Amino acid sequence: MSQFLYLVPTLTILVGALVLMFMSMYDKFNIKNHIFASSVFLIIALLFALSNVSNSFSVQPYESFLNNVLTFDSFSNFFNILLIAGTLLTLLIGEHYFQHRSYFKGEFFSILLFALFGMMVLAQANELITAFIALEIASFSIYIMVGYNSDDSKRVEAIFKYLVLGSFIGAFYLLGMVLVYGATTSTNLADVSTFIATANQQDMILVYIGLTLILFTFLFKIAAFPFQSWLLDVYRGAPMIITAYMASTFKIAIFSFFLRVILDYISPIIDFWDTILSVVIILTLVFGTWLAVTQQIVKRMLAASSIVHTGYLLLAFIALGYKDGHLINIDSAYAVMFYLIAYLLSALGAFGLASHIISETNVKVTFDDFKGLAKQRPFLAAMMTIFLLSLAGIPSTIGFIGKIYVFTEAIASGYTLLTVIAILATIVSVYYYFRLIAVMYFYPAPDNCETEEFDDKRVSTYAIMFVAILTVLGGIGSAIVFFIPAMNIDTLINFSQVAVQSLFIR
């Protein structure tokens, strides 16, 4: 019974998806009803997940319940909380956007919860087949949401490109899984880990090749070089709020499984991947920076910059290191976890606020559309500035703390050159992020615009404001709100440490 309780957050989301699917069959339920129902299920699931936080350093493998294909521990619960919170914030931030797009129907919100269900299962997956099924549930839900408005040719092109490339790269995962099974006679990660620890180098060839093919699948999903070609077109073609969801929450789900596999099961392969990941990191940082600098559409600029943030996260991964049978720098795993929190808030806030601004229009969201925003809507301009400062890694924001954490651990592991390149990419990022800030504050507003006072009572505005507050408190929380533990930077870091350390308790 206790094992079942740990599944309640995931099952709540699944039940919610099914209920919303049936609700969509009846015309009497409007968009507001679907948003409300979705929010209720998400809040219930979040409360159940938060209730499990007290079970720190716990590992509950479902050996008798689900044949050990899922694992519950503080690590998976950490990601459950992030994924549910990210989905809930996406829903609330996009509330105004959803209501002003007639093509959004009730079944869309069911698909959104199915995507979350797949992500949560992925975060708890303890077996390669289970992980693949969870990944595909989430991915196909995302495909549908990307191309939800079939009347828009850009979205049709985006979903076709994403679907074809995603299906193609999924074959790499399957091939890699077959090779791993051929070598180890198992797809359970615990069995694969045992084989890696005891086998000689000659027997490891198939395992290395198979796991590398699986690595390519995840590099595609997080849009690392050279698998980033789909990102700009797909992000541009997708509805703005779905772009926000893909750039933040979905990316976190991918990293959740990737990090679990590296830390808990196949850490020796980090040494084998060292050269591959080093090259990928350099090219991801350089190419992502070049793309971001050359964009004229804000949506594409933010999309390109997300490639750069992928490079930062991969830098923290490679900094884990492996020598003499153990990880060299476990603190780097804490850096990954903290940076994921920082990136979730910053990226979701920036993309979500852009969707909020254009919710009543159909513009492409170029830099010109933000001219004089500080005069037109000063409150929204201030919040966008906070998110951009955090993405750029400017002090007093959570993004700054995250970057410092990642760069410090990378240097400690001996990756000084990669860190220097990452710092240079950060310096260049100041240009394209501050370019948007300059447009908002130093360019004249259109002649026909009127200044709006802060009397916006929409749910979206308050949700964005909440994320902006967290972004600032995550950067200076220890200094100004030390008496509120939940707002303390050290609390977030400790939460990350507990999540990682639970993987090593058996």
UniProtKB/Swiss-Prot annotation:
Q: What is this protein's function per UniProt?
A: NDH-1 shuttles electrons from NADH, via FMN and iron-sulfur (Fe-S) centers, to quinones in the respiratory chain. The immediate electron acceptor for the enzyme in this species is believed to be ubiquinone. Couples the redox reaction to proton translocation (for every two electrons transferred, four hydrogen ions are translocated across the cytoplasmic membrane), and thus conserves the redox energy in a proton gradient.
Q: Name one GO molecular function term.
A: quinone binding
Q: Which PANTHER family match?
A: NADH DEHYDROGENASE (PTHR22773)
Per the UniProt record, the source organism is Aliarcobacter butzleri (strain RM4018) (Arcobacter butzleri)
Q: What is its main location?
A: membrane
Tell me a GO biological process for this protein: ATP synthesis coupled electron transport
The record's subunit annotation is: NDH-1 is composed of 14 different subunits. Subunits NuoA, H, J, K, L, M, N constitute the membrane sector of the complex.
In the UniProt record, does the keyword Transport occur? yes
Return the protein name. Answer: NADH-quinone oxidoreductase subunit N
